[in-house]
Amino acid sequence: MPDPSGFLPSQDGLAFTNAWPSEPAVVLPTPFGKINIGNAAAGLCGGMVFAALDFWHTGIQPPATRPAPGEPLYRYIVQRLVDSWHLPAGVAQYYQWMNLPDGDSGFEAFGRRVVTDRGLAWRTIQTQWPQIAADLDQGTPAALGVVTVASASPADLGFNHQVLAYGYDASPSEVTVLVYDPNSGQNDGIYIRFDPRTPTEPTTFAHNINISHPVRGFFRTAYAPVPPPAS
C-alpha cells in the first residue's frame, strides 16, 4: 500500500505509546469554558502526533526513551498537545462535529431532497479527504482530528482522538488511510477505511485504532512545524 509521504510509524513514530503517569490536568480555555483534556494519564495523543511530525520535518530521529514528567521532552509534548487543539477554532470544530448527524439532514419538497445540513460523512469524504489526499500526494503527512462521539457536552471533547495520516490506497469503492496512532506505537498496520460512494448517508469508518469508540469522521488539523527540543 502506498506511503507517499515517506513517513513510517516503525521508524518515525515515537518509540513509546500514549500511556503516561497521572499528572496535573491540562486545562484549555475554550469558547465553552475551561475544558479538562487530561490528566496526562488520559493521553497526550495530539502532542505525540505533532511531536512525531516535528521530528520528521527536521530529519531528527525521535528519542527512544519515554520522558519523565517535568523533563524538556515531556513539557514539549504537552505544549504540542495544547497546540494541536488550535484554540479557539480547533475546539469549536470538534464541538460542531460532535453535534452533527452522521448523514445529511433535510426534507422532501416537490419530489426533491432539500439538504439543510451536511453530516460527518459528507464533510469528511467530500471536503476533508481531498485536502488530506493532496497533502499526501505532495509527500507531506497530515495530522487528523478524529471525532468519536456524538454529544452536546463540552466535557466530552476529550473523548476525541488525533492520529497522523501518512499514506493511502484508493479505489472507487474503498479508501484506506494509513495512520500513525500514538496509542498503537510504532505499528505500520493501523488504518481508517471507508466507502466514498454515498457521502450523503451515514458511512462506516472501519478502523483498528486503539480506542474504544467508533470513528464518526475526521478532519485535517492546523499543523505548523516547531523545532523539537535538543536531546
Please report, for each region that a protein language model flagged, where it lies by residue.
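Active-site-adjacent substructure of cysteine-protease-like catalytic cores
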Residues: A121-V179
